[in-house]
Amino acid sequence: MTKAISMDALLSPWVDCPSLASVLVSELELDSRKVQPGTTFVALVGHVVDGRKFIASAIEKGANAVIAQACDVKAHGTIDIIDDIPVVYLDALDKCLSEIAGQLYTYPDMKLIGVTGTNGKTTITQLIAQWIGLVGSKAAVMGTTGNGFLDDLKEAANTTGNAVEIQHTLASLAEQQAQYTALEVSSHGLIQGRVKSLSFAAGVFTNLSRDHLDYHGTMEEYANAKLTLFTQHQCAQAIINVDDEVGAAWAKQLTNAIAVSLAPTTEFEHALWASQVAYAESGITIRFDGQFGEGTLHAPLIGEFNAANLMLAFATLLSLGFDKSDLLATAAQLQPVLGRMELFQAEHRAKVVVDYAHTPDALEKALQALRVHCDGQLWAIFGCGGDRDAGKRPMMAEIAERLGDKVVLTDDNPRSEDPVLIVKDMLAGLSKPAEAIVQHDRFKALFYALENAAPQDIILLAGKGHEDYQIRNGETIHYSDRESAMQLLGLSS
């Protein structure tokens, strides 16, 4: 819960400032536009914006004090007074902000589960939260599709919020009696120290494939960022997908690792594996074995990667002490996650599957998963984001051509880039570019596919998933793949 504490106590042991003992802090805010009278403004030097530029604006809005990032070590601990408002400077504020916020916002009895990896974070966090609810406890999520309880998610700007938002949200969820919270932990969030002070009852690694190289530079640096969840944070259990090459290496290094695999394995001391996996229209059935004993798990999900997601969620809950028989009895009630391999179908029409796949690996796994269920032709409709890693554009096109029967190239979020040039990059990955359909309007792209597809065909509409917007030329407009699918198939929302 949130409590008001003195600035002196809040900043201890980083700064000794007894002169600020009378300044009470009850709310921290990094966005000067959201400052209200009595709020304490945090002026952080971010990756793009220097929050110190907005100190005057925050004071004008009624900030009772400012905690600002110092220019250097010499300025650490200095205090300025601006319009009677104290501004205290801390060196490396970005590195200790999570811990500072943790001293203000507390949630003593809640267990945290951190999920990291390129793909699968949203699905696993939501499966965990659903499952915990089905067996009678209360769980929330924090991540891409929002923060809160699954029936009342609040929109989130980033996969992993800033250090203050995270602590504030966790305290709020604890006040609403959340016993567990499953958090998506991005590589950005780990590198920037946003979850530094959190104590995780379990950490989960899904997989590693090409993404965010515009930020990390190399795959090695990207992998190292993910690894810090297990090596530089408090993490009691490490649930690791060892079918991923990187995960297999980590599981051999981490003493608290539980290896999870879709194939029998004897390499790891602690493991849960599938001895048999069956895929059907009704979902996935897994025969499992390992340190938690054996049994059969069935859930109404589609595809091999969802089998991996399901096993990782299952292993996590078993490691936290949930009863195996209770989990097995409720698994059939698990629901597919919004915009994640979400099926839309109408009589005598091709099936449409909406998925968030926006990396080469995710697109490949989505198409492979659907091929098992497809009796006709498999269509791939997708685009690539602007102002992001351009190297993956031809890679994704090559995957779509290789694994799909029909390829439709469209726009994702072009942002400030010319959509024509983005598609040109994608076409470079095709061996037969003349056979691809180019339709920049996503709604029209799906309309074209549905008009030309047979009832036994499956159309994968990839890239946006749960999102209900599109970004082009600096403008955010309303658009939803899910709404497009429902409208074109004549389904009610």
Curated annotation (Swiss-Prot):
This is UDP-N-acetylmuramoyl-L-alanyl-D-glutamate--2,6-diaminopimelate ligase. Signal peptide: none annotated. ATP binds at G117, T118, N119, G120, K121, T122, T123. It catalyses: UDP-N-acetyl-alpha-D-muramoyl-L-alanyl-D-glutamate + meso-2,6-diaminopimelate + ATP = UDP-N-acetyl-alpha-D-muramoyl-L-alanyl-gamma-D-glutamyl-meso-2,6-diaminopimelate + ADP + phosphate + H(+). Its EC number is 6.3.2.13. The modification N6-carboxylysine is found at K226. Meso-2,6-diaminopimelate binds at R388, D412, N413, P414, R415, G463, E467.
